[in-house]
Amino acid sequence: MKQLSSAQVRQMWLDFWATKGHSVEPSVSLVPVNDPTLLWINSGVATLKKYFDGTIIPENPRITNAQKAIRTNDIENVGKTARHHTMFEMLGNFSIGDYFRDEAITWAYELLTSPEWFDFPAEKLYMTYYPDDKDSYNRWIEVGVDPSHLIPIEDNFWEIGAGPSGPDTEIFFDRGEAFDPENIGLRLLAEDIENDRYIEIWNIVLSQFNADPAVPRSEYKELPHKNIDTGAGLERLVAVIQGAKTNFETDLFMPIIREVEKLSGKVYDQDGDNMSFKVIADHIRSLSFAIGDGALPGNEGRGYVLRRLLRRASMHGQKLGINEPFLYKLVPTVGKIMESYYPEVLEKRDFIEKIVKSEEESFARTLHSGQHFAQGIVADLKEKGQSVIAGSDVFKLYDTYGFPVELTEEIAEEAGMTVDREGFEAAMKEQQERARASAVKGGSMGMQNETLQNITVESVFNYNASQLSSKLVAIVADNAEVGAVSEGTASLIFAETSFYAEMGGQVADYGQILDESGKVVATVTNVQKAPNGQALHTVEVLAPLALNQEYTLAIDSNRRHRVMKNHTATHLLHAALHNILGNHATQAGSLNEVEFLRFDFTHFQAVTAEELRAIEQQVNEKIWEALEVKTVETDIDTAKEMGAMALFGEKYGKEVRVVTIGDYSIELCGGTHVDNTSEIGLFKIVKEEGIGSGTRRILAVTGKEAFEAYREQEDALKAIAATLKAPQVKEVPHKVEGLQEQLRQLQKENAELKEKAAAAAAGDIFKDVKEVNGHRYIASQVSVSDAGALRTFADNWKQKDYSDLLVLVAAIGDKVNVLVASKTKDLHAGNLVKELAPIIDGRGGGKPDMAMAGGSNQPKIQELLDAVAGKL
């Protein structure tokens, strides 16, 4: 077996499949593009769903890739096992309706065992297969596998929701009896027992059925085009090839671990307790790549995953004695390890380091808050005479504050308490099951549409024509190809079209289809790309249409031009965001509609009013400079040399369109644009908001809509000016400042009146002093408009020696507010209000001298007041 570096293993995989006619698909962003079903790209095939479900027919049906992926269903296992990771690389080879079982198995065996390639010893390889899949069993024997190395497994059938499915055959490497201390042997494989002897290195899925959850597996229909979908974990392959005990002892992780050794002063013990080293090495890889791809730590979705990973890694750093931000220092090491295939980490190093360090510092503050929360739990339990911290509280400390259970157990032990481990595990399991359910739900592929897949006639889009004559080459009605159609809805394909199919965030053209006499025979209501790339016109049929006849295609030119203005403005906006916010503010999604444009971009905080003003100003300046908009067609490499901005994760063909706007913007884009920025007229941002962790959204309008937006603002200002009796709009700020000053004065006077009224009322309330067990107390219901007035009563009470304790209750709206104030150490206001609050179906708490509670059961107010004496 050859000794290879991880970079060599990856490259050898890609090179081998290239010799078999496969196109090398580059690794795409971990953040899915145009796929809301996925939180992360979680497999090599996830980026190819559009090919497998038949939405798009690839230029080459043979594809290979090395795809970075993230899975976070079982984060807690990372570091505990030899091969569990959050981020990993999946090597794959795929056939979209081309070769099938025989070639897939033959070539897999060749790649693994040929001296020219990996040169694995054949006797070390074992294969599992689906019992009913005799064809795979026979093929393995034909290529030279000993039948005793073929193990039938009932679970070897791949399906995930609706869509492509089929039997799979897995390849395992036998590391020998040294990794099988109980000498169980092949039962480890046959009974699917977790083990370190037989390492799964490759799974070949023979995708031949359309899975349908509504019917039994035996009734699944055959796919019109059978596919091959395979996945080999790079980390596992490298561990086997490099003879490493675990994946972490390979050149993918050890450089990171060595850096952690330097930072901690601790030594990584391969056979000892090394979990913290593994967790840190794994998690910083995920963080570096995910942040580099535009995801940012936050409180939901992808952001929550990253925040959790960072906090877990940070806590393990503390276990190694690292008590300051350190993860950001590991980013360059991650970048250097992966540089040969993933240069983006080093290219974005400064930004990634900045985000990681900021999040580490934030976590340090959160951890401090968590310690206060934990101490509060301990104090409450002591008050109640209890000694077990509830599993729900342990989970909250873990989930909200990043506290590992061990830290909570230490706090509990110091207080002479224990932790409800079972309750915590139950809460953890519930969360993991939710995550798994979500992952399964989002993983399915759509059903293949055989009719559209089989339409292979050529069709071209004419960018320059708003109207042209073209032959009708395909008609689809009721999901079948027909020769003519006379009514209803149909889908049409023409040899040439002037209609833009929805793509790249630009909406489709609308318009009409006319016959030779000029009669409108159909209205076009939508245009989408068919699987083989043709423009598929959805039409309402008004008169008979027949195949191979010439028709005139006329788009709605006014609609197209309005969309073009918004699309070109989007390019200007993208450039302005880079200039003002930074190069990290890249496109995360866009929509160029008729009346507006919507642009999503990565940014780690809300855009300030000053920044928005500067962005809007810069875009308008470029509009008024009347910059020429040019489009050229070239190959992708030339386009990148020109400096064209490519959207990370987007798939580009060999030939691309480059759109330049003066020397201000240059992007790869397949959409339609104005010829000169002056055609846009005006640009106005109408809204900026966050739509998820690390993602912001700008809504803007151009041209007539921008003018109308400004006019609406002007009309509103004029209305305000009239209300304020300001002769001119420019005097409105001065008038408003005057009103604000008047309001402040009135509020001050009102507060003074309230204090006087409270003092007057207090005179009567404070006279009603009772005594029990040597404690003087006042317990009374008062009539006030807000809870703040209760505090005013308490402030007045503190001024004189009326009593030791004050309890005030007020019905405000449909709620009940309670205030407890104490002047003696013997009476703890916070504890007392906690005991009283349940009477009114409420909760509360506070300090020893002042506490408040809120509830909803107003009929129980008197019962609460009567209960005070019994609590003293």
Swiss-Prot record:
<dbReference type="InterPro" id="IPR018165">
    <property type="entry name" value="Ala-tRNA-synth_IIc_core"/>
</dbReference>
<dbReference type="InterPro" id="IPR023033">
    <property type="entry name" value="Ala_tRNA_ligase_euk/bac"/>
</dbReference>
<dbReference type="InterPro" id="IPR003156">
    <property type="entry name" value="DHHA1_dom"/>
</dbReference>
<dbReference type="GO" id="GO:0005524">
    <property type="term" value="F:ATP binding"/>
</dbReference>
<dbReference type="InterPro" id="IPR018164">
    <property type="entry name" value="Ala-tRNA-synth_IIc_N"/>
</dbReference>
<feature type="binding site">
    <location>
        <position position="571"/>
    </location>
    <ligand>
        <name>Zn(2+)</name>
    </ligand>
</feature>
<dbReference type="GO" id="GO:0008270">
    <property type="term" value="F:zinc ion binding"/>
</dbReference>
<dbReference type="InterPro" id="IPR018162">
    <property type="entry name" value="Ala-tRNA-ligase_IIc_anticod-bd"/>
</dbReference>
<dbReference type="InterPro" id="IPR018163">
    <property type="entry name" value="Thr/Ala-tRNA-synth_IIc_edit"/>
</dbReference>
<dbReference type="Pfam" id="PF01411">
    <property type="entry name" value="tRNA-synt_2c"/>
</dbReference>
<feature type="binding site">
    <location>
        <position position="673"/>
    </location>
    <ligand>
        <name>Zn(2+)</name>
    </ligand>
</feature>
<dbReference type="InterPro" id="IPR002318">
    <property type="entry name" value="Ala-tRNA-lgiase_IIc"/>
</dbReference>
<keyword id="KW-0436">Ligase</keyword>
<dbReference type="Pfam" id="PF07973">
    <property type="entry name" value="tRNA_SAD"/>
</dbReference>
<keyword id="KW-0547">Nucleotide-binding</keyword>
<protein>
    <recommendedName>
        <fullName>Alanine--tRNA ligase</fullName>
        <ecNumber>6.1.1.7</ecNumber>
    </recommendedName>
</protein>
<keyword id="KW-0479">Metal-binding</keyword>
<dbReference type="GO" id="GO:0140096">
    <property type="term" value="F:catalytic activity, acting on a protein"/>
</dbReference>
<dbReference type="InterPro" id="IPR012947">
    <property type="entry name" value="tRNA_SAD"/>
</dbReference>
<dbReference type="InterPro" id="IPR045864">
    <property type="entry name" value="aa-tRNA-synth_II/BPL/LPL"/>
</dbReference>
<keyword id="KW-0862">Zinc</keyword>
<dbReference type="GO" id="GO:0004813">
    <property type="term" value="F:alanine-tRNA ligase activity"/>
</dbReference>
<dbReference type="GO" id="GO:0006419">
    <property type="term" value="P:alanyl-tRNA aminoacylation"/>
</dbReference>
<dbReference type="GO" id="GO:0002161">
    <property type="term" value="F:aminoacyl-tRNA deacylase activity"/>
</dbReference>
<dbReference type="GO" id="GO:0016740">
    <property type="term" value="F:transferase activity"/>
</dbReference>
<keyword id="KW-0963">Cytoplasm</keyword>
<keyword id="KW-0694">RNA-binding</keyword>
<dbReference type="InterPro" id="IPR050058">
    <property type="entry name" value="Ala-tRNA_ligase"/>
</dbReference>
<dbReference type="Pfam" id="PF02272">
    <property type="entry name" value="DHHA1"/>
</dbReference>
<keyword id="KW-0820">tRNA-binding</keyword>
<keyword id="KW-0030">Aminoacyl-tRNA synthetase</keyword>
<dbReference type="GO" id="GO:0000049">
    <property type="term" value="F:tRNA binding"/>
</dbReference>
<dbReference type="GO" id="GO:0005829">
    <property type="term" value="C:cytosol"/>
</dbReference>
<keyword id="KW-0067">ATP-binding</keyword>
<comment type="similarity">
    <text>Belongs to the class-II aminoacyl-tRNA synthetase family.</text>
</comment>
<feature type="binding site">
    <location>
        <position position="669"/>
    </location>
    <ligand>
        <name>Zn(2+)</name>
    </ligand>
</feature>
<dbReference type="InterPro" id="IPR009000">
    <property type="entry name" value="Transl_B-barrel_sf"/>
</dbReference>
<feature type="binding site">
    <location>
        <position position="567"/>
    </location>
    <ligand>
        <name>Zn(2+)</name>
    </ligand>
</feature>
<comment type="function">
    <text>Catalyzes the attachment of alanine to tRNA(Ala) in a two-step reaction: alanine is first activated by ATP to form Ala-AMP and then transferred to the acceptor end of tRNA(Ala). Also edits incorrectly charged Ser-tRNA(Ala) and Gly-tRNA(Ala) via its editing domain.</text>
</comment>
<keyword id="KW-0648">Protein biosynthesis</keyword>
